[in-house]
Amino acid sequence: MADYKKLIPLIKEWEGGFVNDTDDSGGPTNKGVTLATFRTWFGANKTVNDLKALTDEQWIYIFLNGYWNQCKASEINNQAIANIIVDWAWASGPKTAIKKVQSILGTDSDGIVGPKTLAAINNAEPRQLFNKIKAARLQFVENVAEQRPKDKKFLNGWKNRINSFFFEEGAANMGMYGILAAGAVFVLLLIARKWK
């Protein structure tokens, strides 16, 4: 199963300190956390100065409860797939990312990771699913930049971030294809034993 601790360094690599770019639709951010998100989790009375003082503990709390757990990522078998889904949720919001992934999977696009969505993720051929999600995410940011011209200056950075994610098979990947492969190995071992 995927481990959130393996994703955190990948996200933090792309998130600096406090930024207040007037062209950024998210407004003031610190370590990738917007003021609106900070207020959602720690109170509507929180100020920009409170956001500037965001602690690592607060960051982890938001990351886990607002993004990782929303995607049920601990129940995703492949780490690379969990990483790219949760990072998309982090960048675009969980509902948006989950709906896009559900569209790829052909499940109901309700923005909630339930048993059917989770099963579809874990039973898909991992590399193909990862590549489809990555391609969809690249197209998504292209569309955002097209629809919001002021965001075009961020497009190359968004694409570089997405392209920094690579597929890894991972020992934890035991979806349908992993189970079939394990079964095939078991059968071969039985045959080899029989002919000894």
Summary of predicted features, one role per range:
Residues 1-180, 187-196:
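Cell-wall polysaccharide-cleaving catalytic domain and substrate-binding groove, primarily
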